[in-house]
């Protein structure tokens, strides 16, 4: 499976669910993570499309067929209207994404992916580009889609295929 195929299979549906969830807007407003919700929703989307998606096989968040997917939510410390200003350890969040990539690389899955939601942020934010680069250097390729939670809080969802020939 390619990153484009997984992106096409999941991202429109998950973005619709994010944008229509008043509960997630509360999370975004407080910069709170929602990985458990994301896991349930991704499995629901895949199951409705005929995939036998399961949670926590070999400690991997979501898997089906030969595909393993790790999920993360990355709450940033960048100031935005409608979002509480708090200190968030973005470096630790990025390290957590890369740890999940490292865990997945050592599995038997043929196709290994990371899907992560970053918020509040826009894809072209200069501060974010540095942090994103620390993740994407571990990816063969990736796609993204920018969206807004209700309340005009910006977020970006990324879907990347993990490079198997990393140094």
Predicted regions mapped to residue ranges:
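Hydrophobic/aromatic-rich structural module bridging two neighboring secondary-structure elements via a short loop
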Residues: 48-70
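Domain-level recognition of nuclease-like catalytic cores that cleave nucleotide substrates
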Residues: 113-167
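Short, charged, amphipathic alpha-helix that recurs within catalytic cores of restriction-modification
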Residues: 85-114, 124-127
